Structure formats: structure tokens, C-alpha cells
Amino acid sequence: MTEKKSSQPSEATLFTYFNEVSIIAQLIIAQFERSLPDGLTNSQFSVLNWFSRVDSQASPGRLATAFQVTPGAMTNTLKKLKSKGLVKIEPDEFSDRKKKVSITSRGEKLHKKAVNATAPLIQEMAKNCPLENIQTQLAQLQKVREYLDQRRQS
């Protein structure tokens, strides 16, 4: 009798998969951060990037939740961005206790400059990674991210 193979990955395979994703993230973030202009850190760029792709304004709490960091860590990042003139932090018009954060035109310009500064890194990756492989992997990674994102919110 032949044993039926499971289509489910083993725990060891999943551990190795997520370990590889983690190492890739560390490597790319280190390279990416070296290319960022004007002393911008990856966490600061990530907040500016969030504003460019998700919403024009948010509370510090919403940002902390989106980035899965403590409110204190997000406040620290926002203070640094504000001191550089990249975000504006104002009182919320509906609540005296809450604040709203938005990207400034200077922040938008630096975000574009940062994206452009990473172009050589992206171009190098494009030369060394076949498009078909990237597209297949991207689809799978998006499914994993969506699954993990749903679990985070439940």
C-alpha cells in the first residue's frame, strides 16, 4: 500500500520558510536603509510610505497598530519625522485628547526622493531575479501576508 502524501507543509518546512523570509527582510532592510537620503531611517520611511499608499492622515494609535509597534515607539518615530518637517501632528478636531498625523509636502518630496534613491537596488535585483519567479513568489507571499494580517485582527 502506498502512503498518501499530504499537500500541507510540515512544521519544519514552514519554520524554514519563515526563517528565510525573515533573513531576506533583514538583508533588504539593511541595504535599503543605506540608500535612503537625508538620514531617513527605514522606520521613518515606512511611515511616509504608509501615507503615500494608505491614507492622508491617521492617529498615532492607528499607525502603531498598522506597524505593530507600541504607541511609545510610534510616538518616538513621529517626533523625529515632525522635527524634520516631514509630518504634521495636530489636535484631533473631535477629541481634545487625540492627535492626527499627516504627511507634509516636504515629507512627500522626501518620500519620492527615497523611492528614487532605491532604484539602483531594485534594478540590480531585477537583473538577478527572473520576472516569472518573482510573480509566482509574490502571489504566494501576498496570500501568506493576507492570512497573517487577518489573524492579527481577530
Annotate each PLM feature.
Residues 1-38:
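N-terminal leader segment of winged-helix/HTH proteins
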Residues 30-70:
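N-terminal helix-turn-helix DNA-binding core of bacterial DNA-binding proteins
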Residues 37-41, 73-76, 80, 130:
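Short glycine/proline-centered loop/turn elements that form peptide/ligand docking sites
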Residues 113-154:
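Terminal interaction helix/tail motif
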Residues 13, 36, 43-44, 106, ...:
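N-terminal positioning helix adjacent to the helix-turn-helix/winged-helix DNA-binding module
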Residues 19, 46-50, 75-77:
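Base-recognition residues in the alpha-helical recognition helix of bacterial helix-turn-helix
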Residues 55-108:
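Canonical helix-turn-helix DNA-binding module
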